[in-house]
Amino acid sequence: MSEAKPAGGGALVRLLHPRSVAIVGASPTPGALGASVLTNLERSRFSGDIHLVNPNRDVIGNRPCLKSVDALPLGVDVAVLAIPRVAVLDTIRALAARQVGAAVIFSAGFAEGGEAGMKDQRELAAIAAASGMVVLGPNCLGFVNQVHGVALTFVETPAVPLGDQPGVGIVSQSGAMAAVLGVMLGSRALGVSYSISTGNEAVTGVEDYLEFLIDDPRTRVIGMIVEQFRQPRRFLQIAARARQAGKQIVLLHPGRSSAARESAATHTGALAGDHALMTVKVRRQGVVLAESLEELGDIIEIAARCPASPRGGVLYVTESGAFKALTLDLCEQQGVPLPLLDDQNAPLFRAAIPAFVPVSNPLDLTAQALVDPDLYRRTIAAAIADQRFGCIVLGIIQTDPVTSKLKFPPIIKALRELKPGKPVIFAGLDDGAAVPPEYIAGLR
């Protein structure tokens, strides 16, 4: 597939930070796409102008309706098309005539729907190119901008202002996965700056939005779910820019199997390339690859809470000999540096832990901290003082609220008192354990 002309940053601003929005296919029916978009806009307290278009209604709620796109004022920033696929091309032509800057198209059935759909998608792209219109989609869920309070999506979206801290940007060809990832990050108390679903990428693609987020001061980490890069060379160039700017990209890249590549073609019309080759190339540019959606969330959280990449090795603290062995296998597989520890080269650790516990890395504390809770503090203090370690991972077993009460308070107290100058990652074992939420909040 030939590489499209990049969308300019100014054009994307009209889409992602609009001053005026038109909803084509506005509806009073709860659950209808147009109704959901309006609800999200009002919930996010969008401060710009909202124009509703519905030929069969004079008013929806307290807002007047226009009979057609032709009645829109000139130069509306973005129009959301909550209409059937058969009406999309004529509507895009009419929007171009009204000098609308951008369009969000939910409708499916274009490139992923066979030759006829592909032909219509090419026509859509040609109209947009001739008019300078930015198009998000088709076959997408739209986007959410929590920085400025704009939610142009039909998925119910709570208004969660970003606050003063930089957030996580999400760019995904899959709208459903973008929504799931956003909920996952919210449950981890991580703010999302932008969440953008690109769908079929008829006009703009993941590369355009990645470039926008790299230049966005409110975005620190960028999570991506991409089945196929339509502009791979450009993506690698932008990834290099992200690395220079200190912004971590974390990528979930489905498509390793032939079946997954066929699925991508029916999902977003993507033509998946050489997955193994792309994996090597993106890693060279500092992109971190995730193997699952859950791992994507974990890596994003680590990158967001530890913005400076640690220098030096990793100390793993475990409470299980079996988990120690699993950790050693995984570290060897992933090439994680593990400085060797023993009684002779680690006197601080030897003094901190019981005599029957071997000094090693990973360091297996056994269950001793249940009767000696200060063991956590002594171990963490030794790791902080040891310059061989740039990062500490606490693999703590969590099984029930009673055990959690014995373990979490001394760990939280130790971290608050010691104020580590290096990242400490709490990797609790057994995510199904009923750990009181105040302990999780205390660790964060």
Describe the residue ranges of each PLM region.
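Catalytic-core regions of core metabolic enzymes
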Residues: 1-444
